[in-house]
From Swiss-Prot:
One Pfam family this sequence matches: Hydrolase_6
Source organism: Staphylococcus epidermidis (strain ATCC 35984 / DSM 28319 / BCRC 17069 / CCUG 31568 / BM 3577 / RP62A)
Record-given protein name: Acid sugar phosphatase
EC number: 3.1.3.-
Cofactor(s) the protein requires to work: Mg(2+)
CDD domains: HAD_Pase_UmpH-like (cd07530)
GO cellular component: cytoplasm
Family matches, as NCBIfam families: HAD-SF-IIA, HAD-SF-IIA-hyp2
Length: 259
């Protein structure tokens, strides 16, 4: 296995599985920390702040810092503030998205006369929230969604994800949003900018082919698939573009790096 100068790392299915630890995850991060190898946690989760993400990782005995976390909410806020500083925004979403938008100097309004509509996962979404978003998009607001995941794994099973919520507005208006999170390149390009390295020096680590592995492929970096989450080894064998590597777990990756 190639020795990369830095890694972009998925969370659920790679670092942990729901509320369960994944063997090899904490050990892999310890290996990176001990060898001073930069890494960022890249997540489509828009509901949590980097501090909250870090708290979850530490519960899993993973030594992480908030400045190592790139959420789809952060990437969305940065993207809008670069395009249109001080823009007005109507948002559907959670605490993580609201915090990211306001920290970026954007003004959140509760009506349909805004510059942008931003949709992130909102477990308390209502018909009225979707109505305001729909009217704002029809009025000409730019339409952005933090990520396209149509379902998310929960203890009860797979529940509606942000892509499902977003689809209500896109179907109603006939306008497709710009997605920020994986597998799109915006969140990945932001992460690469933070690292400041060449693409050939960075690898994406994740379990889900359509999201994690494709995000690496789309942005032009190598990919490391771990068989600890959703996509199995058999699944990835049928793909037109396979990951650069596929390992049973991150313990195997450590063993490869220590050769």
């Amino acid at each position: 296995m190639k020795h990369y100068q830095a890694y972009l790392i998925d969370l659920d299915g790679t670092m942990y599985k729901g509320t369960e630890e994944i063997d090899g995850a904490a050990q892999f991060i310890d290996y990176l920390n001990n060898n001073r190898i930069p890494h960022l946690y890249v997540t489509n989760n828009s509901t949590k702040t980097p501090v909250q993400v870090t708290e979850k990782l530490r519960e899993m005995h993973i030594d992480a810092k908030p400045d190592e976390v790139v959420t789809s909410a952060l990437a969305t806020a940065d993207y809008i503030s670069e395009q249109h500083p001080n823009a007005t925004v109507y948002m559907i979403g959670g605490h993580g998205l609201k915090t990211a938008l306001t920290d970026a100097g954007l003004s959140i309004k509760n009506d349909e006369h805004v510059d942008y509509v931003v949709i992130g996962l909102d477990e308390k979404v209502t018909y009225e929230k979707l109505s305001i978003a729909t009217l704002a998009v029809r009025n000409g607001a730019k339409f952005i969604s933090t990520n396209p995941d149509v379902s998310i794994p929960k203890e009860r099973g797979f529940l509606p994800g942000n892509g499902a919520i977003t689809s209500v507005v896109s179907v109603s208006t006939g306008i497709q949003p710009e997605f920020i999170g994986k597998p799109e390149t915006i969140i990945m390009s932001k992460s690469l900018d933070i690292l400041g390295l060449e693409k050939s020096e960075v690898a994406m680590v994740g379990d889900l082919y359509d999201t994690d592995i494709m995000s690496g492929i789309n942005v032009g970096i190598d990919t490391i698939h771990v068989q600890t989450g959703v996509s199995t080894y058999e699944d990835i064998q049928s793909k037109e573009i396979p990951p650069t590597y596929s390992f049973k777990d991150l313990n195997v990756a450590i063993a490869e790096l220590e050769k």
